[in-house]
Amino acid sequence: MKHLALIGSTGSIGRQVLQVVRSIPDTFIIETLAAYGRNQEALISQIREFNPRVVAVREETTYKELRKLFPHIEILLGEEGLVSVATEPSVTITIVASSGIDALPAVIAAIRQKKTIALANKESLVAAGELVTTLARENGVQILPIDSEHNALFQCLEGRDSSTIKKLLLTASGGPLRNKSKEELQKVSLQEVLRHPVWNMGPKITVDSSTLVNKGLEIIEAFWLFGLEAVEIEAVIHPQSLVHGMVEFCDGTILSVMKPPSMLFPIQHVLTFPERSPAIGPGFDFLSNRTLEFFPIDEDRFPSVHLAKRVLLEKGSMGCFFNGANEALVHRFLAGEISWHQIVPKLQALVDQHRVQSCLSLEEILSVDAEARARAQEC
């Protein structure tokens, strides 16, 4: 049996994690849950179904309600509760299914307790890649990627000699605005931005997909996750979203992972790793998917990927600043304070102004993140 901690249980990834757990009986035990969203009814339902030892929440009203409903379960509040969920002694795999930097202290604590990390939280690596990966190496901890593209690369790289690897290729659907001209992009609406052609995701990541900032974040994440210093990391537009990642080797061979655009596949792969279990949904059908298209990213319309590569080259505090500033700008767009076409220019201006510093501690990282968000609110 695998004993799981699940951070972000009521979000999109968290719910799909539990779907996989249900589909493979007698394999997993949900030891702890953390839900920092406002979907109290969903969390109550999960607690009744999985009967975890410990539950952590952010809202005090939810905390009080859960203590009344479940007196036999340890209910915790705030960041300390999140860390407790991630580091519960009975847990062997800590699944980080939430988005945002709020999960970073729990990720670091779980690594120090030598928990295997199943990671769907790209912010942890973008903002604190050096700290997280250094701690993982020192503690002999494996980080298993849940993000579809990184999971595909992980499968292609498994057991390979790193000296034979030439290039990592991440695919991007192109987002909801991929076919719009530069002029049309000046006046897109919130409704257009949130209408993703392939994936059903939360609003923040859907906006990131529309600007292609998400792909830039994934390039940074891939650098820290796989630690291949001399290997080129590129992104290409693949509208069908059937090829999720490719690895090119020195002899010209390219390996890829192909599957339907569903997060259930990478989640199941990570939870059952290193074993494999029968798929819980239909797999890839070559006969009904005869067309696979690949296009270069138009950097004139979508300059964010180039900006992210620059951020990666500068390292230090730049990834943390880039991530925090982008998140604040996206929230301003969702609140109607700025237009879509202002997000990336404002982000670039903020990056240009940031003075890179070393970020070796959690406290330094959180300080830079707070600075980035404050600056993004003012610009």
Swiss-Prot record:
Which cofactors are required for activity? Mg(2+); Mn(2+)
Q: Which residues bind NADPH?
A: T10, G11, S12, I13, R38, N39, N121, E123, G202
Chain residues that bind Mn(2+): D147, E149, E218
Q: What Enzyme Commission number does this protein have?
A: 1.1.1.267
Which GO MF terms does the UniProt record name? 1-deoxy-D-xylulose-5-phosphate reductoisomerase activity; manganese ion binding; NADPH binding
Report the top EC class in one word. Answer: oxidoreductase
Q: Which reaction does it catalyse?
A: 2-C-methyl-D-erythritol 4-phosphate + NADP(+) = 1-deoxy-D-xylulose 5-phosphate + NADPH + H(+)
Is Zinc found in the keyword set? no
Q: What keywords sit in the KW lines?
A: Isoprene biosynthesis, Manganese, Metal-binding, NADP, Oxidoreductase
- List residues binding 1-deoxy-D-xylulose 5-phosphate: K122, S148, E149, S173, H196, S209, N214, K215, E218
* InterPro entries, sorted: DXP_reductoisomerase, DXP_reductoisomerase_C, DXP_reductoisomerase_N, DXPR_C, DXPR_C_sf, NAD(P)-bd_dom_sf
The record's family statement is:
Belongs to the DXR family.
Protein function: Catalyzes the NADPH-dependent rearrangement and reduction of 1-deoxy-D-xylulose-5-phosphate (DXP) to 2-C-methyl-D-erythritol 4-phosphate (MEP).
- The protein's name is 1-deoxy-D-xylulose 5-phosphate reductoisomerase
Species of provenance: Chlamydia trachomatis serovar L2 (strain ATCC VR-902B / DSM 19102 / 434/Bu)
What's the gene? dxr
